[in-house]
Curated annotation (Swiss-Prot):
This is 7-cyano-7-deazaguanine synthase. It comes from Neisseria meningitidis serogroup C / serotype 2a (strain ATCC 700532 / DSM 15464 / FAM18). Pfam families: QueC. Zn(2+) binds at residues 188, 196, 199, 202. Belongs to the QueC family.
Length: 219
């Protein structure tokens, strides 16, 4: 695949950084770009991490401003004063309606202009937080929609879709970057450097790491 190019939807978190490093290994650094979205997220430190990691890995990064989302939707992920809770339907109030649909749309528009067909997203439905737009059925339908909308053969890849968080840590270890992911990425919804250990994202991350390290010791 060295003659093909890929665009990674990149937040600076554990999953997207794992995907970015994997893409570099598959396609070659010179063939990989990252696209990052500023949408008013309360964990803005994530954006700082994304910029640093992209620069450190030598990957071109494009940052798009989608903060207009604040004008049309409200959720705990974009409101510093809101408590993070889970609704009766099981969906946390950190869910941003339409976020991944918008991310994929804008990523596709950018990718086509760059002659890129491969779009990579770190979404996962195994150990996910109950977000409907992290499901494989959504991504596949979006892939078809974008191909039809732009008459272009996009291929959306979700390498973590069926991996547990423990398996995602294992993948990072296999690529030789477990410590890098552990020390350099940011996942906390509350924007606390090093993690708050209380929000759903921190809990998933820490639980997965503990499970992986425990299984590694048992081998």
């Amino acid at each position: 695949m060295s003659n093909q190019k890929a665009l990674v939807i990149f937040s600076g978190g554990q999953d997207s950084t794992t995907c970015l490093i994997q893409a570099i290994q598959i396609y070659g650094r010179e063939n990989v770009q990252a696209i990052t979205f500023q949408y008013g997220q309360r964990h803005a430190v994530e954006l700082e991490r994304a910029r640093w990691i992209a620069q450190d890995l030598g990957v071109k990064q494009t940052v798009l401003d989608l903060s207009l989302m604040r004008q049309i939707t409200h959720n705990a992920l974009m409101d510093d004063t809101a408590a993070i809770e889970t609704a009766e339907n099981g969906v946390p109030n950190t869910f941003v309606d339409g976020r991944n649909a918008l991310f994929l749309l804008y990523a596709a528009i950018y990718a086509k202009g760059q002659g890129i067909r491969h779009i990579i997203a770190g979404v996962c439905e195994t150990d996910f937080s109950g977000y409907p737009d992290c499901r494989d059925v959504f991504v596949k339908s979006m892939n078809v929609t974008l191909n039809l909308a732009m008459d272009y053969d996009f291929q959306i890849h979700t390498p973590l879709m069926y991996l547990t968080k423990a398996q995602t840590w294992a993948l990072a270890d296999e690529m030789g970057v477990l410590d890098y992911i552990r020390e350099q990425t940011h996942t906390c919804y509350n924007g606390i450097v090093g993690g708050c250990r209380e929000c759903p994202s921190c809990i998933l991350r820490e639980r997965g790491l503990a499970e992986y390290l425990e299984s590694k010791k048992a081998v």
